[in-house]
């Protein structure tokens, strides 16, 4: 799948991870690295978790493992530390271990949207689409607004992966209604599909964006490039005119004027 489904970077109460340098600073404040205090300090466990996930997203797997293992050792009953290890095990391809860890986390936090979304993403990555959708559907029933948007988005991309276009369109459109900021990720995905030469997938994502959100310079530029590639000169000029009227100072309009498709 070209769009990551994992919600690991938003594991801690829906907030993105801090930069590595900031996490190091916090770690030094709450207790010296590898000091005896670290073994029982819950704040250190959360900092180790954040640090491990930051290393994971930067693909520094050895450092990620070391910090996530320390987080689990300090706070083994905290579902967040166990979920962090599940994400690591999933990343390195230890799917059997990840499955066991996810089941453990589900028992620890059965009504948690982040757990459901991450487990659903894991199942979707294995092609277990029906089981994945059960997790996403359960997460979508939770009252937390952001978790509903995440669940709809993940379910939509899972259907997108499975080639179930109608369901993908419906769910991704709903996700954008809940959280319009998700349009940024959708356009990024559409650009990746376009660069990979996947015209039908690109068209679908453009249509979802177009029918759900106001046009942006980036969305218009993608439509222009798509029309140019397809030889639809009328559409290319039409979108170019909209770009000129709405975003005359944008870099996308400068590319259009230079015919840099």
Predicted regions located by residue number:
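Bacterial Sec signal peptide processing site at the extreme N-terminus
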Residues: 29-47
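Terminal, low-structured helical/coil segments at or just beyond the last alpha-helical repeat
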Residues: 211-261
